[in-house]
Amino acid sequence: MRGWRQWWAICAMAMLLALAGCASTGKQMSALERAQYTWSAAIRWGDFEGAWNLVDPEYREAHPMSELQFERYKQVQVSHYRDLASSPGESEALREIEIGVINRHTMAERTMRYTEHWRYDAAKQAWWISNGLPDFWAGE
């Protein structure tokens, strides 16, 4: 009888530990979803300076944005922002996006694809986009 109780106690402890691990992973995924929603809202509404605050601080330091570069983003309007595919991981995630971009001066619209690279910073408990703002002028 005593062996049976010990076995149940060990199983109960194992399940509690497993649930605790799931809870932390769940919180991390929930934080990723919130960060991605905040990012996509900033891009959709043309708040590129706000979106810049969600870019990995190491990337921002290595690739600072000038006022002229931010002004260039004011020349476009985002018409749509669609999540095509995503592959979340424990500390990194990828998301393939389709973005509709309208040139405010010519009113010409075009569609582009952009891959978001996300990185989890355990020290700050935050997800950061690690590849900067979308380059609407790639190849121009």
Name what the model sees in each region.
Residues P88-E140:
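Exposed beta-sheet edge and beta->alpha loop/turn motif
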